[in-house]
Amino acid sequence: MHGRRHLAASLARALTYAPSRSISSTPSLLQTLDPSTPSPAAAPPTAGRLAELRQRLQADAPSLGDFTYSVEVGTRKKPLPKPKWMKETIPGGAKYAGIKAKLRELKLHTVCEEARCPNLGECWSGGETGTATATIMILGDTCTRGCRFCNVKTSRTPPPPDPDEPSNVAQAIASWGLEYIVITSVDRDDLPDQGSGHFAETVQKLKVLKPEMLIEALVPDFRGDPACVEKVATSGLHVFAHNIETVEELQRNVRDHRANFKQSIDVLKLAKEYAPAGTLTKTSIMLGCGETPDQVISTMEKVRAAGVDVMTFGQYMRPSKRHMPVSEYVTPEAFERYRSLGVDMGFRYVASGPMVRSSYKAGEFYIKAMIEADRAKATTAI
């Protein structure tokens, strides 16, 4: 226990990027909202200026979600500036253009675009390994949930799934010549099977066209339905991924109210139980949401106890002003400490860094090597 407290304290010292701030006198509320508002000693504003102020207040008023977050977690008056290590690459290149054109042609969606992933340019263009990758998003581009970190569109009644989507996705992926693909989806609480049948069909059709391809399915929680989990876990995939997104203590502040930590852990346990031997399980969390090092360590311990093989850590990036603010920018040194700790805990692979995302190209490269090594061992044993 003493060692864990020491590690948490060490992480806390390296954790936060905190630029200096100047302190100035505090103006009145109306002066803060409208710099042209006179001081209390001056004459009262005209009716026209009052009407203008009311319009500004209405336009800038926080949503109920923003108000709730400000009470529960706390917000900053100004967004934190990005530190030097949070640099994004501008997308480009022939492979990038080719993948984007094919996606538009078949009316397919990627989480890379919908979630504004900072690694989109690297993954689509091939990056260091030369193999282009993309994370395909099925079941449409509209989610039935409204997590406070996610930029995907939401609706209680999204359009019905395209029955041709499994075939279109399989054909598109097969034509790209990839070795490893990630298939994910929005939440579809409106469907009787939560979309699990559509998911399984997509994997199965792809296996027919490209039997040698390694497939990772990054799935929603299916409301914890064991039958839905089993349907996807036994569809022929190699990696069953489901993200817990944040530490246990911040679940209600970060995720939709229909999601929770226990339900996600149970989904990962069920996947390990139902999937064929050798199938890897994987999860991911964002840092910079207000968590403490001790909470991260505790969450890692519970994830590992659920039998999860792979865990990734990345920096939360606010997609827009409508989403929850970044609490802090976690330093690369702190990310490295979490990676090292994860390896010590027994995770087979840990990807941890500011720009890492759950579907991360470098991680997929190492996971592919792990799967091939497991296959080689199994063949030798036979």
Curated annotation (Swiss-Prot):
Biased composition (Polar residues): 25-34
Substrates-to-products reaction catalysed: [[Fe-S] cluster scaffold protein carrying a second [4Fe-4S](2+) cluster] + N(6)-octanoyl-L-lysyl-[protein] + 2 oxidized [2Fe-2S]-[ferredoxin] + 2 S-adenosyl-L-methionine + 4 H(+) = [[Fe-S] cluster scaffold protein] + N(6)-[(R)-dihydrolipoyl]-L-lysyl-[protein] + 4 Fe(3+) + 2 hydrogen sulfide + 2 5'-deoxyadenosine + 2 L-methionine + 2 reduced [2Fe-2S]-[ferredoxin]
This protein's record includes keyword Coiled coil: no
Pathway where it operates: Protein modification; protein lipoylation via endogenous pathway; protein N(6)-(lipoyl)lysine from octanoyl-[acyl-carrier-protein]: step 2/2
Cysteine disulfide partners in this protein: none
Gene Ontology terms for molecular function: 4 iron, 4 sulfur cluster binding; lipoate synthase activity; metal ion binding
Region (Disordered): 25-47
Gene Ontology CC terms: mitochondrion
UniProt cofactor note: Binds 2 [4Fe-4S] clusters per subunit. One cluster is coordinated with 3 cysteines and an exchangeable S-adenosyl-L-methionine.
SUPFAM superfamilies, alphabetized: Radical SAM enzymes (SSF102114)
EC number: 2.8.1.8
Family: Belongs to the radical SAM superfamily. Lipoyl synthase family.
Name of the featured protein: Lipoyl synthase, mitochondrial
Organism, scientific name: Oryza sativa subsp. indica (Rice)
